[in-house]
Amino acid sequence: MKPIALSIKGLHSFREEQTIDFEGLSGAGVFGIFGPTGSGKSSILDAMTLALYGKVERAANNTHGILNHAEDTLSVSFTFALQTNHQISYKVERVFKRTDEMKVKTALCRFIEIKDEHTVLADKASEVNKRVEELLGLTIDDFTRAVVLPQGKFAEFLSLKGAERRHMLQRLFNLEQYGDRLVKKLRRQAQEANARKNEMLAEQSGLGEASSEAVEQAEKVLEQAEARLEAMRKNRDQAKERFTEHQEIWNVQKEKSTYEEEEKRLAEEQPHIDSMQKRLLEAETAAALKPYADRYAEAIQHEEQAEKEQTLAQKDLADRTAFFQQKHEEYEAWRQHKSEKEPELLAKQEQLSRLQEIEIKLSEAKQEEERKKADLRQKEEALQSVMNELETVTDRLTRGQNRQTELKQQLKSLQVTSDERKSCQQAAEMALRIRQTEEQIKKEKKRSEELNLVLQKMNEEKNTLVQKTEAEENNIIQAYEAVQTVYHLVCETERSLTRMTEEARKSQHTLHLQREKARVALLTKELAQKLTAGKPCPVCGSTDHDPSASVHETYEADSHLEEDIKRTDVLLTEAAALSQEILSAKIMLEEQSARFIEQCPFLQTIQAQNLEAAASFEHQPVYEAFETAKFEWKRIKQDILSVKTRMAQMIGAYQESLKKAEQLNEKIGFEKREADRIESIISELQSSMDSSLNMFKEAFQNQSVDEAEKWQQAIEEKDRAAEECEKRIEKSIAFLAEHEAQKEKLRESGHRLEREKLELHYAAERIKSVIADYEHELGDYAKGDSIQIKLRSVQQDLKLLKEKEQSLYEELQSAQMKLNQAKSRASASELTLQEAKGRLEKAKAAWLEHTKNTSITRTEEVEQSLIPADELEKMKTGIDQFMDKLKQNAANLKRVAEILAGRALSESEWNETVAALQEAEDAFGAAIEEKGAAAKALAVIRDHHKRFNEIEAELKKWQMHIDRLDKLQAVFKGNTFVEFLAEEQLESVARDASARLSMLTRQRYAIEVDSEGGFVMRDDANGGVRRPVSSLSGGETFLTSLSLALALSAQIQLRGEYPLQFFFLDEGFGTLDQDLLDTVVTALEKLQSDNLAVGVISHVQELRARLPKKLIVHPAEPSGRGTRVSLELM
């Protein structure tokens, strides 16, 4: 863990935000934080713990009184890095707001991971505290004992008791993984192993009979079934051969009957087919003539259409010729009119255009004349305004000079001598200090009275809380005894259930043997009943059967045997589940008891009374005992739930009371210290005020404190009046200079305006002469309509002449084009008519030629004789199919006659053959099923036999695994292993610290660990005598604690993976002489090579002179400015 930056604002004496750059500060390995006493050096460490854990250890209630009295908000921000393979940075931000004079509340809290971008990991105070402790693996107590050592905490690790020191080392060196976590892991594995064992026992019980004798019996049954199957197969094959022969004759006979019926049906259909063939011939003839009939009818239609079109074209040609002649005459007449009118209009247009230009110039000249007159009037007005303003400025300047003279005389009368001012100032300062001291004494006395009332209430509350805590301890002891009693009941129930389960397994084995013996006897009896005298036995092959033997060996199956086996199987399954449930409850009670002892250490001495009587169902029959056990277990479960809930509630209330008592003690201690401090302040203030009054009387015998204040006020009034005079004189100097400059500027403006006025007058006269010349040129044209209107009229007449000519020309061209089109259509229609007549003659000749040998004479008959193509195709297909069927049926009759060759089969003979085959097939199928059932039964028994053996082997392995886990649980019970590791780690730290201490004390002292885990000193200078650490002097305690802290910091790995890269000291250097101080600083300077930065907080000047990099803490100022920090390099 490496610090990067720390920002502080509003904490203790800090007001403005101050940022400390640790990266630049810790580059040399060792750096110092220096400043006078009370400047705020220790507040830097407070800011670090406040940012990380939200607490200031030396503050009451961890946060009371930490906010600067002149601020309403406090903010801290700490950025640090954790170095693994690659460095990851984190930033913790906290902002607090004031709630009253002492208390603050969290306003903002964030924990940020800094990589390529910032990621907020937590934004609530509790979550941030949890994430910081998880990341670092240190509580605030660990942090202030091993990393950041504030005032009063330096020697705490040295004096910690053994158990508390071991717990701290467990967290510092991440030893929890070898303690509770390892025990829980072993317990979980043991629970899983027992569950697996119970599952296998239940599975083994459910397999039923799986002995080797059962396998052999099943194999014999399978051999008998195979022999029967072979006999049935031969019988079925013979029946199949006879069936195949009769089936062929029967099927051919049925086929012949079908062909004879088909022959009769075809003979009845023959007349209809003949009619269809005649109609088909007529349709084919009409189809051949249709193209000629269509061409003939089309030619007649085209000839009629061509005659109509030719008539219309001739009429259109005559109309277009008359229209063209009319347009040609109109165009020629307008051309003649244009040639006469156009020259006259063009001459008039040119004259009007020149006069229009003159008219525009005249208008512009008149506008310019008006502008010049307006400018002239403006200049005259501006000149008058400047002259008026010049008169006003001159008057103000005179009055200002007179007032300045008066102010200078007044200032001279208000001046105070330096001696008078000095005496007055001394008297006022002494009077102010006396008044301030009086007010402070009143304020502190009031605070003292309020604190005494608060302390009285707190002591009353403390007495009540002590009584409540003692009562809660007694209740917890009673509840814990109840928990232990329930635990013993659970253990007794578990042992009884184990014994009952063993008895049930024995009973199950006996029942299975009885069932197998009864099944063999029953099979023997059934086989003996089926034997016939003189025939061989299918099992042994003997022909001599002794009925007495089967009767003698037959056993009647017990009707209750199967029911007893099922009951036993169910009981074992339920017993396994109940055993698992009891084991879980037992483990849960053990864990709960451990937690209760951890939360309430006084419970370690409490032991529950042993139960003398065992469970009441031990000597009952198995089934009754199991029902009793289930009933008892339900009652015990209720007891477990009851005592667990009751115990948890009591411990919660007890811990809450302890927490309240601890908080109350802290508050009482703080308030007592605060009351003592206030009394001391009041005494000091009273002494200071008496001394100040005596000094005032000696210095100013003729004045009282009140008169001194009034004297100071009088001088201050004179000073304020003189200051006001000086300000007014300064303003008057600027005022007079400004008005003098303004007066000169106004004079220049008046001269300039006079010149501009004359220039405008002359320009207006010149423009008036130009206007007269333009009006003379226009003459009479300026009267009546404007020249622009006359010019627009002439231009409109010229435009009309051209547009009308163009329009008539376009109409003439259009008429010409339409005339040409009409001529083309007339010629084309004449040609089309001649061609239509020729085609008609050819089509008529072709029609007559092709119909002369047919019965069709008119084109209409062709359409009447035609048949649609799909219907025609259907008729052809029907005729072809009929002919094919006729031929095929004759061939089939011939073929079946050859196959039968005179053979015949009656229906009764065929039915007998079918029945015989079915009977043979049924017998063969029954034999197959019988063999399959026997084979399946054999396979099931073999699988069960194999699985039974596998489970037996696995049970042995699991039992060995459970035994090993039980041994490990016994070894790791309690925290002995973790304590061993912590002691080893402590020995390592002590060896390293002893080497450092030996160097610091010139081989005089060494440190060792005693048998109880505490530290003792070895005085090598006095023959190795051991001394308790409590006998050390202040300087010796500092050196020993420093050695331990450096050794601990060098070995700490946060969460077992992050190296600790910094260490802070905040006391102790003042107890060292010059030689020891040099030795300590030299040792600290050597730490740079160990990748460990050490920060030293001190006010010792000799230490400040030795360190190359220093952070200087400047104390707060009376003006209100807060503590500031600055970096100083050697």
Swiss-Prot record:
Set out the biological process GO terms recorded for this chain's protein. DNA recombination; DNA repair; DNA replication
- List each coiled-coil range: 115-135, 179-270, 344-530, 652-904, 940-1004
Q: Which UniProt keywords apply?
A: ATP-binding, Coiled coil, Cytoplasm, DNA recombination, DNA replication, Endonuclease, Exonuclease, Hydrolase, Nuclease, Nucleotide-binding
For this protein, the record's Pfam families field holds: AAA_29, SbcC_Walker_B
Family matches, as Gene3D superfamilies: P-loop containing nucleotide triphosphate hydrolases
Q: Where does ATP bind?
A: G35, P36, T37, G38, S39, G40, K41, S42
Per the record, its GO cellular-component terms are:
cytoplasm; DNA repair complex; nucleoid
Principal subcellular localisation of the protein = cytoplasm
Entry GO MF terms: ATP binding; DNA exonuclease activity; endonuclease activity
Q: Does the keyword Coiled coil apply?
A: yes
SUPFAM superfamilies membership: P-loop containing nucleoside triphosphate hydrolases
UniProt subcellular location: Cytoplasm, Nucleoid
Q: List the disulfide bonds.
A: none
Q: Which InterPro entries match?
A: P-loop_NTPase, SMC_SbcC-like_nuclease
Complexes and interactors: Heterodimer of SbcC and SbcD.
The record describes the protein's role as: SbcCD cleaves DNA hairpin structures. These structures can inhibit DNA replication and are intermediates in certain DNA recombination reactions. The complex acts as a 3'->5' double strand exonuclease that can open hairpins. It also has a 5' single-strand endonuclease activity.
Q: Which family does it belong to?
A: Belongs to the SMC family. SbcC subfamily.
Protein name as catalogued: Nuclease SbcCD subunit C
What species is this protein from? Bacillus subtilis (strain 168)
